[in-house]
């Protein structure tokens, strides 16, 4: 996605870089469908999923949402499912390990928020093989939400090199989660999930007290640790 930024201010409805093809930035093919889809957030704010305002949510809202959005369709060999918040911290850590140079705060923030759309757009992490069946309108909605995130956190566009590094870390995290969390076998990971990366044996994350390697964290723990990393990076990037 070619990311762009605007000078929209808090409280203004953000129309994003997606083409404004109809009233309320709703595509003509959506004629007759609702023009608002509100979500009431923990902070009391409201987010319109069809025309997201970049300042509608708080950082705490986002952390809570990601801690309650689950990988692997919510299934797990553990007592708890794996949250996207924990996955995001894993990918960021793996990118830091793989990078020849230290990630800038903006690059690290982009990694941390790479799946943030999932928390804001209904709290669903759609498994990859299902995505092509959701249609162009869902892709358009996701692009609008990503544009709102880009504006809110001033995220830089991916370069070819940084995106390749990100995808490598994301696939490595997926392979490792598949083995240690979802209980796929190494053979199934390569042949059925078609992930070529070899799963890690050592969990790259610093483990919270009382947690084992690869064990999914409780939502409160995942939200707290994600929020701490998010706010640390925001303070270093100068994002609002």
Predicted regions mapped to residue ranges:
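Metal-dependent phosphohydrolase cores
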Residues: 2-240
């Amino acid at each position: 996605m070619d990311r762009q930024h605007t000078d929209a201010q808090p409280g203004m409805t953000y129309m994003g870089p997606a083409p404004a093809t109809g009233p309320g930035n709703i595509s003509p093919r959506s004629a007759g469908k609702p023009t608002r889809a509100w979500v009431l957030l923990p902070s009391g704010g409201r987010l319109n999923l069809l025309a997201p305002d970049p300042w509608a949510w708080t950082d705490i809202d986002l952390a809570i949402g990601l801690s309650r959005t689950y990988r692997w369709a919510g299934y797990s060999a553990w007592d708890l499912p794996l949250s996207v918040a924990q996955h995001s911290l894993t990918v960021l850590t793996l990118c830091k390990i793989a990078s020849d140079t230290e990630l800038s705060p903006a690059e690290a923030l982009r990694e941390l928020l790479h799946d943030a759309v999932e928390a804001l757009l209904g709290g669903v992490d759609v498994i990859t093989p299902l995505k092509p069946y959701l249609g162009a309108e869902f892709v358009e909605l996701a692009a609008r939400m990503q544009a709102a995130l880009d504006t809110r956190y001033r995220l830089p566009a991916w370069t070819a090199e940084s995106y390749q590094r990100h995808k490598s870390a994301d696939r490595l995290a997926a392979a490792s989660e598949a083995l240690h969390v979802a209980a796929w076998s190494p053979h199934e990971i390569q042949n059925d999930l078609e992930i070529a990366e070899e799963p890690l044996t050592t969990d790259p994350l610093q483990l919270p007290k009382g947690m084992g390697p690869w064990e999914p964290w409780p939502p409160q723990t995942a939200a707290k640790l994600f929020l701490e990393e998010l706010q640390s990076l925001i303070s270093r990037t100068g994002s609002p």
